[in-house]
């Protein structure tokens, strides 16, 4: 039973039953929202339904292979498919045809919602809705205003996310990567460059981050920290260090070399670090336990 206010959202369809889609489904269903989960692959859908239903016992989660049937009665459609612009644009067009009045949301982590909805009817009823992995644990959801997104659509997205127990934040300009991923990949760019330029090895980069800035970021964000230490000191440090920090507008040659060589990280057994059998699962469990502990202690 719905308790509280979901704004104009009374039913939800989630398109894409992969890791993100199935867990988003569990979160929304756990809040009591009637929900349909759809995926074109029946085997994937069956697995996802079992996982989502385990997250929300007793709640109504339906499965549907046909996209139009899944979204036709939904007030909110959340797209959680592969990170491919053409695929997302095609899905949005099909969803809009089947659900002309629905609020369409993309879980893209980097693609601007305005690019996905270019030329789409009812673009005022679209938002970016970037959930972080794992979506059932990370509180923040970035709600991105596209070029044509209405204030009503932003408010509706906010209301339903708050109802589901999430912490939505407003991203008022539709830039690639939004807020979190722009910050994250600025750090990754410099981390990879430190390795590529021989300043230190990969293990040292991770050890330094985990035992310095990583310890305090959950308690004090970068803007508050700049204020905390003093903006005069921040300016002096920037004047010294920024000229030597990597500012490339293209991906690292070392990163490209590793991908070309099939060194893809945990999935291939070798990336910047070696990965043995079971080490990825162990890392995932360690990460989930750490996030859960951080949230419990907030």
Regions found by a protein language model. Name each.
Residues 36, 180, 184-188:
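Structural/interface elements that position substrates and couple domains in central-metabolism enzymes
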Residues 31, 141-174, 185-217:
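Internal alpha-helical scaffold of NAD(P)-dependent oxidoreductase catalytic cores
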Residues 2-3, 31, 163-166, 197, ...:
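NAD(P)-dependent Rossmann-like dehydrogenase/reductase catalytic/cofactor-binding core
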Residues 1-55, 98:
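NAD(P)+-binding Rossmann beta1-loop-alpha1 motif at the extreme N-terminus of oxidoreductases
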Residues 40-44, 56-103, 110-111:
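Rossmann-like NAD(P)-binding element
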Residues 103-181:
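Rossmann-fold dinucleotide-binding core
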């Amino acid at each position: 039973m719905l308790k509280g206010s979901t704004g104009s959202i009374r039913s939800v369809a989630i398109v894409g039953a992969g890791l993100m889609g199935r867990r988003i489904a569990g979160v929304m269903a756990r809040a009591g929202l009637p929900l349909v989960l759809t995926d074109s692959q029946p085997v994937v859908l069956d697995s996802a339904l079992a996982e989502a239903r385990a997250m929300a016992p007793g709640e109504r989660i339906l499965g549907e292979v046909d996209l139009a049937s899944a979204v036709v009665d939904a007030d909110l459609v959340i797209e959680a498919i592969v990170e491919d612009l053409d695929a997302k644009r095609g899905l949005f067009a099909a969803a809009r045809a089947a659900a002309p009045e629905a609020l369409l949301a993309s879980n893209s982590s980097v693609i601007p919602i305005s690019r996905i909805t270019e030329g789409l009817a009812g673009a005022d009823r679209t938002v970016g809705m970037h959930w972080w992995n794992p979506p059932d644990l990370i509180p923040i959801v970035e709600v991105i205003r596209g070029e044509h997104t209405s204030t009503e659509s932003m408010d509706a997205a906010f209301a339903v996310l708050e109802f589901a127990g999430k912490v939505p934040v407003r991203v008022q300009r539709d830039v690639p990567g939004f807020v979190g991923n722009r910050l994250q990949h600025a750090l990754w760019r410099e981390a990879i460059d430190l390795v590529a330029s021989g300043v230190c090895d990969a293990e040292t980069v991770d050890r330094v981050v985990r035992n310095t800035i990583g310890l305090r970021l959950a308690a004090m964000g970068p803007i508050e920290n700049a204020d905390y230490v003093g903006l005069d000191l921040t300016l002096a440090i920037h004047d010294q260090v920024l000229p030597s920090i990597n500012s490339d507008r293209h991906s690292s040659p070392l990163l490209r070399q590793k991908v070309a060589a099939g060194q893809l990280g945990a999935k291939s057994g070798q990336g910047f670090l070696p990965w043995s059998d079971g080490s990825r699962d162990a890392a995932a469990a360690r990460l989930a336990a750490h996030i859960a502990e951080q949230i419990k202690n907030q």
